[in-house]
């Protein structure tokens, strides 16, 4: 019995005892860069967790991650082997308790159209499985990569919850065009906006409120180590 349990743990079939974690479905070519960005983003947290569910062997995933990432800072990376569209597998990685879910696309943009369509369909099935796991409750925010314009629209309208579907080629093409037509400073702005080096943006609302109406000038004194920002509309 002990050996069977040990073998199950090695295969990555056991329950994940986490909540408020970042869940990644799939283990593609960009997984290392995604993990690195998440590690950097999590440095402000004392104990953060990334859980990865993929059909790859758990030991292989662990070795690839260890070989490519040296410093995990405050983030623990947990891998599990399983099918990303399987409801029982999603329950084992506590999908409904995640703070956000990233669904990786298994096909790179240069692959044949048939392969891209199959990969997009798998992403859509994964999203529907996440919705099923949550059983009527609001699901965690989902970010996914989908190649087809039609399937991206379908993904974002398949649920009332938050689903953001991106197309790698479209996003990069727009950024490259804007950089080519602008001055060099735009590249610095993009780096600051999408990276986690230096200052970051946080949305904050104290549990006890602000103690009454505040002007923007009055709010500045409430922050010791950060700078408040806001939006000034035409109505003031």
Placement of each model-derived feature along the sequence:
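Cytosolic regulatory regions of ion transport systems
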Residues: 1-236
């Amino acid at each position: 019995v002990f050996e069977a349990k040990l073998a199950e743990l090695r295969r990555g079939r056991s329950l994940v005892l986490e909540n408020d974690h970042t869940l990644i479905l799939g283990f593609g070519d960009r997984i290392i860069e995604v993990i690195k960005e998440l590690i950097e983003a999590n440095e402000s947290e004392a104990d953060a967790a990334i859980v990865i569910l993929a059909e790859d062997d758990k030991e292989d995933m662990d070795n690839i991650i260890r070989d490519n990432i040296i410093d995990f800072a405050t983030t623990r990376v947990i891998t599990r082997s399983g099918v990303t569209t399987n409801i029982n597998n999603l329950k084992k990685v506590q999908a409904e308790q995640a703070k956000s879910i990233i669904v990786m696309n298994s096909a790179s943009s240069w692959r044949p159209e048939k392969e891209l369509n199959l990969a997009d369909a798998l992403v859509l099935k994964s999203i529907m499985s996440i919705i099923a796991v949550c059983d009527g409750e609001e699901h965690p925010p989902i970010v996914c990569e989908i190649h087809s314009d039609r399937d991206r629209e379908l993904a974002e309208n398949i649920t009332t919850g938050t689903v953001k579907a991106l197309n790698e080629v479209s996003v990069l093409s727009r950024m490259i065009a804007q950089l080519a037509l602008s001055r060099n400073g735009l590249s610095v702005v993009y780096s600051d906006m999408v990276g986690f080096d230096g200052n970051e943006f946080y949305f904050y609302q104290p549990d006890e409120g602000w103690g009454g109406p505040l002007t923007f000038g009055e709010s500045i004194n409430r922050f010791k180590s950060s700078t408040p920002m806001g939006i000034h509309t035409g109505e003031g």
